[in-house]
Amino acid sequence: MHSRFPRPVAHLELHTADLPSAREFYSELLGWRPELIEAAERSYLALDLGEGPSGGIVECGTDRALWLPYVSVPDIVSATERAKELGASILLEPREGPAGWRSVVRAPDGGEVAFWQPKASVPLDAA
């Protein structure tokens, strides 16, 4: 699955237990203006990061805040299975949302990465 061009990061998300503190810090530090989106499960701050990937801050029961990159893949099931073959544990099986599918894996070294497959998109190798 090696390619001349790496898969692009499509979305960057901060997972935190303290949404108000994260909102204030990143707004002051980077000039981001998060937009609150109330979801059934939890509060979410959508971030406009300018050109490049989108972003968000999600409130969840984490011991420490962590940034989770969402990497664009052409086939979410294959990418998730390949990660498992390479020793990753699956934290979130491929799951459909309004705009696409996502999954989350933890690498053998403990790092986490999410895979993202949009519902409608230009093929990644067409760009």
Regions inferred by a protein language model and the residue ranges of each:
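Conserved short beta-strand elements that form part of the metal-binding/catalytic scaffold
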Residues: 32-66, 105, 112-118
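Glycine-rich beta-strand-turn "strand-cap" elements at beta-sheet edges
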Residues: 95, 101-104, 111
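Short secondary-structure junctions
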Residues: 31-37, 89-94
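N-terminal beta-strand motif that seeds the catalytic metal site of vicinal oxygen chelate
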Residues: 1-23, 67-69, 116-127
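Conserved, structured core segments of small domains
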Residues: 46-62, 69-72, 81, 91-92, ...
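Vicinal oxygen chelate
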Residues: 9-17, 60-86, 101-106
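Conserved active-site tyrosine of GNAT-family acetyltransferases
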Residues: 22-26, 83, 110
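K/E-rich alpha-helical interaction surfaces of small helical-bundle regulatory domains
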Residues: 21-35
